[in-house]
């Protein structure tokens, strides 16, 4: 009986002596065969064959006795029972590695070039590494003889015939199954075709009914749509007429609005340019602060680096100190050892001296005894001389040792001095380190302060921007109201009219920003060219100090504000309109005037208590001489006017913007 254990196609490298090496796909089969005549034996059969070349055949039958000789030759550690499985494992490793570019396990078949030679071919299983190619197993296979090839071909033909028979049986069974299935499917197809015809007929009848219904519904819907269309056309024409009338009105309104907006746009552009210049200045300051911040950062990094270098130097010096301490300990130990040696030598000297004394005593005794013992005395004297020489040598050794000890003591003293110096330098460096750390902390605190300053400056910038916006709104509203009131006074025949009763004065003591004349009173003539001195536009710094931030230009004037004029014939040549406010509010140097964009005319920056009012170009009339007002409050500029008596019937008008004060304005 033969059991097939392994049968696979492997890639084997074929090596010939006289031809080139090549690789071929060879089928390797491993079988276990048991024979019972005359003794029950187990044999392992290894066969190499090629599916493309039927005459390529190599066989090996390996019994237990053959395996023992193979085991001894190649130093195998496996028994015959476990050998087939181990051999198959190695073959599986070769199959796994054969597709890699550099395989670890290789199969090699070394054979002679002449097939007629009955030389065995060796099948080698090789493990490759960068150092050496190791042969794990080498099996010698014999080339198949004619009878073996015939037997192999006969078995192959038998196997093919068996496979052919089984395939024919399978084909016959599959044909029968398919024919049965075909019949069933054809019946099902016929039934489905009948159902399809029925469904088509039903669908045609339903479609005809639905088309008739839909045509009726479409006709009705068309009639409804025509009626609705006529209604909508009528409504559309009416709406069109209404829209045309409304659009014409809105167009006129928008044209007037556009003209107003263009004027406002001009004012806003001028304000924009001024605010942009202010922003540039602030950006310059910000860039300077940022540069200082970067410098401080760089200083901090450099100080940190210096700190790191100092730390490393400290560690190195500590290591040196430890090394010197160990050296001193070693030297102390050596000094102790030398002291022990000196003590021993001193003991030896003492013992020698005692021996000398004993010898002297014996000498005296022997001299007293007899002269016969002179020979012995001579020998003893020689021994004494030798002992003295030994003592002298020991004394010289002692002196040398003492000198060495002195040298070592001097060396230790020097090392102690060096250690003291090193400790002093270490303390100095520690002090320097603490100083550097302290400086670093100071720099970090400065950095934090700079950051806080930067944050505060940014907050102030935002606040100033918001304040600018509110100030601009207030200035626009104030200038607009001033212009309207002045133009109204100029256009009237007598220049004076009473304000509504709601705009009466409340009191001048509690209000801030009162407008009053600081110059002497003046008279008004009947000259048509004579006008009242006009105030300059109000600065943004003044408004930001005396008006709240949420003040909007669209708000109505407060009811407590009134506008009035006071006439005085004594001052005929000069007049000046000023805001009456405390000197701390307007003239104090601590209050920093903020730049504000102009409305319709540029605003002169007020460094001191300058008079404020409207610009001259707002007071020009068509075909008339431009109105001249007073420039600054510092010089006594006059407006030449014809002296005239004031009208007796004109009542004083209270100021709408500055409650509690009557404006001293002449009638035109």
Swiss-Prot record:
Main location per the UniProt record: cytoplasm
Cellular component terms per the entry's GO annotation: centriole; centrosome; cytoplasm; deuterosome
Domain of life: Eukaryota
Keywords per UniProt: Cell cycle, Coiled coil, Cytoplasm, Cytoskeleton
Cell cycle found in the keyword field: yes
Gene3D superfamilies documented for this protein: Spindle assembly abnormal protein 6, N-terminal domain
Cell cycle recorded as keyword: yes
Stated role: Central scaffolding component of the centrioles ensuring their 9-fold symmetry. Required for centrosome biogenesis and duplication: required both for mother-centriole-dependent centriole duplication and deuterosome-dependent centriole amplification in multiciliated cells.
Matching PANTHER family: SPINDLE ASSEMBLY ABNORMAL PROTEIN 6 HOMOLOG
Protein name: Spindle assembly abnormal protein 6 homolog
Organism: Xenopus laevis (African clawed frog)
Higher taxonomy: Eukaryota, Metazoa, Chordata, Craniata, Vertebrata
Originating gene: sas6
